[in-house]
Amino acid sequence: MKKILLLSISFFFATAIFAKNTNEIVGDSGKTLPKVFLLGEYNNAYEKIQNSHPTSLFEYCNNNPDEAFDKWARFLIGMEVYAESINYDIKGVKMWIEVCWENDGKLKYIAYAPKPESRNIDTKELSGFMSSFSNHYNPQFSPGKRVIQNSHASFPFLSR
């Protein structure tokens, strides 16, 4: 009886440890979801992302539009500065974008869709750029919880 109890407890802790370390969302094809993807590519996983990031940037900023705008502007300016630093032309790109930050402020996912009025751009190249950006991104804030922002982006970014 002791062996069964010990085995059960060991199994429980091992399962909990592995579950804790595998917080990756699985895409519709059963593969781990990429860090950057086009909206509409992974519909089921997209829903899971939204559920796993329940706090909007606006809500995180205590419903303060100036603070939320400042954080969003810093993010977009950071993306633009990074594009310039690697000589990638992002000017004229307009998109709907959803950004997911982790508890520590690191980027977890970027989902996007070019707008019809955007300049013509290869989405594979744009996804590659955003993936590289997310790997080089220095968090501007540490929210202490998962945060999500749904918005649009236009480059060059023009502040108000």
Predicted regions and their residues:
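Charge-biased low-complexity segments
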Residues: 20-160
